[in-house]
Amino acid sequence: MKYLNQHEAISVDEELFNEYKFSVDQLMELAGLSCAHVINDCYGSPQSTVKRKVLVCCGPGNNGGDGLVAARHLKLMNFDAHVYYPKRTEKDLFINLQHQCESMGITVSKDCPTLEWVEGEFGLIVDALFGFSFKPPVRESFAPIMDVLNKSKVPIVSVDIPSGWHVEEGPQDECNIQPDCLISLTAPKLCAKKLTNAKHYLGGRFVPPKLQDKYAMELPTYEGNNLFVKLS
């Protein structure tokens, strides 16, 4: 299985939109749904000791959109989701995703949670702040939440890229989030090779075979009707 560099990841995304005519809405819904399924598989069983209250941290881009979708589906899977979404856009897609969450009783807040509150309140954190187009360093406005994620002992599930990591080189000195689980979307990125003792899943069951062949992805087979593959 191939691990994509940043240029390849961006090119694959562009081809999905331009060559294969997927819409952003389609891919975001499929990606976020697969993330929710992974989280339920990992932490939702009756045997799990993880508290079913989840803090979903959403950034301003498509990675954050995946998080908003995941929060909605987690609510339907009987998780108690709370969304931290500080920097919002005027795009209809994101306005609608936020509205859908709020209409289902999910709190969507701009206020950065404190470390003490997170550790006392939540059993899981979903990190959907930055995606594969991110380039370090982290902007100052996101420094407080990154500090919470770096210090928290609550298990973190990162969506596609652990936030603050370089897409190819991995963790940076100032941002060294160590997720309990990484959900790679479409195909793993090079930074995933830097994971230590983390569960690793692949989600986003929408890549056309011709596109897989063009980039020599050699993706694993999704079994049955599963929306994810467990890689490690």
Curated annotation (Swiss-Prot):
This is NAD(P)H-hydrate epimerase. NCBIfam families: yjeF_nterm. Keywords: Isomerase, Metal-binding, NAD, NADP, Nucleotide-binding, Potassium. Belongs to the NnrE/AIBP family. K(+) binds at N63, D127, S163. Signal peptide: none annotated. It comes from Aedes aegypti (Yellowfever mosquito). The keyword S-adenosyl-L-methionine does not apply. Binds 1 potassium ion per subunit. GO terms for cellular component: mitochondrion. Catalyzes the epimerization of the S- and R-forms of NAD(P)HX, a damaged form of NAD(P)H that is a result of enzymatic or heat-dependent hydration. This is a prerequisite for the S-specific NAD(P)H-hydrate dehydratase to allow the repair of both epimers of NAD(P)HX. (6S)-NADPHX binds at N62, N63, G64, G65, D66, G131, F132, S133, F134, K135, P136, P137, D160. It is an enzyme of class 5 (isomerase). Its cofactor is K(+). The lineage of its organism: Eukaryota, Metazoa, Ecdysozoa, Arthropoda, Hexapoda. It catalyses: (6R)-NADHX = (6S)-NADHX; (6R)-NADPHX = (6S)-NADPHX. Residues 9-219 form the YjeF N-terminal domain. Its EC number is 5.1.99.6. PROSITE patterns: YJEF_N. PANTHER family: NAD(P)H-HYDRATE EPIMERASE (PTHR13232:SF10). HAMAP family: NADHX_epimerase.
